[in-house]
From Swiss-Prot:
Entry annotated with the keyword Transmembrane helix: yes
NCBIfam families per the UniProt record, alphabetical: IV_pilin_GFxxxE, typeII_sec_gspH
Protein name: Type II secretion system protein H
Organism: Aeromonas hydrophila
Source organism superkingdom: Bacteria
Length: 183
């Protein structure tokens, strides 16, 4: 009796090839990475979140109200002066110092919940001296903060990259990966 031999691949061979293809695809993806602007924007969004968490810890440990002022190309933490109770830049801390982003990056903040600033307040704020400016976000000594949504935008040639940081009133932060917008 003659045995007829089956042709084809065994399950083990198929799984081995699939695993090798997956490893190669992973290696190629990791070596290519994302677009440079996208990576830089992601880095700055994570930096913002880390410094905000540091400011929350500072507020809790020191028992003080801390403010966050968002500008078009950066942010700055503030505290009230003991003398006149006016807001001033938080100094003496490298981590919580003023941050200036590249001109290609823009920040925009939307306050959630109640609106404690009107459009006329913002016009007045723009006309104020830098020393008299007030924060948009308050960080309370219990770690809570004013809820907000911060949008970071990076323009890179024909593509605009977006990252959104969302903060709730309990101080929890989330980084949302937004889709890229073609122009």
């Amino acid at each position: 009796m003659r045995r007829h031999r089956q042709s084809g691949f065994t399950l083990l061979e198929v799984l081995l090839v699939a695993m090798l293809m997956g490893l190669v695809a992973t290696a190629v993806t990791l070596s290519m990475g994302g677009a440079r602007g996208d990576r830089e924007l992601d880095k700055q969004a994570r930096r913002f979140m880390a410094t905000l968490q540091q400011a929350q810890e500072y507020s809790v440990m020191d028992g003080r109200l801390v403010g966050l002022r968002i500008e078009d190309h950066g942010w700055q933490f503030m505290q009230r002066a003991a003398k006149d109770r006016k807001w001033q830049a938080l100094t003496g801390d490298k981590i919580l110092g003023q941050v200036q982003l590249p001109d290609t990056m823009l920040l925009a903040i939307e306050l959630e919940g109640f609106s404690w600033r009107t459009e006329s307040d913002e016009k007045t704020e723009r006309g104020r001296d830098e020393k008299e400016r007030t924060p948009q976000v308050l960080i309370f000594p219990g770690g809570e903060l004013s809820p907000f949504v911060l949008t970071l935008t990076q323009q890179d040639e024909d593509v605009r990259y977006l990252r959104t940081v969302k903060a709730d009133e309990f101080g929890r932060l989330r980084l949302l990966q937004d889709e890229e917008e073609e122009e």
